[in-house]
């Protein structure tokens, strides 16, 4: 039987390039992905390289608070 909090949590990844650069007329929004991470294996914030359709390239997507 599991004790305490669940190990797997749902996190939201947001494009750091869109957030830093600001939303311009060329980019109509901010790219976000929803994924899961294991809290015990990765206690820090998760950063993955994902494709951003607004930047038209692969950028680093960082974990944000819900």
UniProtKB/Swiss-Prot annotation:
Keyword annotations of the record: Chloroplast, Plastid, Ribonucleoprotein, Ribosomal protein
Superkingdom of origin organism: Eukaryota
Single Gene Ontology MF annotation: structural constituent of ribosome
PROSITE patterns recorded: RIBOSOMAL_L33
InterPro entries in the record: Ribosomal_bL33 (IPR001705), Ribosomal_bL33_CS (IPR018264), Ribosomal_bL33_sf (IPR038584), Ribosomal_zn-bd (IPR011332)
GO (cellular component) term, any one: ribosome
Any GO BP annotation: translation
Major localization class: plastid
Subcellular compartments: Plastid, Chloroplast
Signal peptide: none
Family (UniProt): Belongs to the bacterial ribosomal protein bL33 family.
UniProt-listed HAMAP family: Ribosomal_bL33
UniProt name for this protein: Large ribosomal subunit protein bL33c
């Amino acid at each position: 039987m599991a004790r305490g909090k669940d190990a797997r949590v749902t996190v939201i990844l947001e494009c750091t390039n869109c957030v830093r650069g600001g939303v311009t007329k060329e980019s109509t929004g901010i790219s976000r992905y929803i994924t899961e991470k294991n809290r015990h294996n990765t206690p820090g914030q998760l950063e993955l390289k994902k494709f951003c359709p607004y930047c038209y390239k692969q950028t680093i997507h960082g974990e944000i608070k819900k």
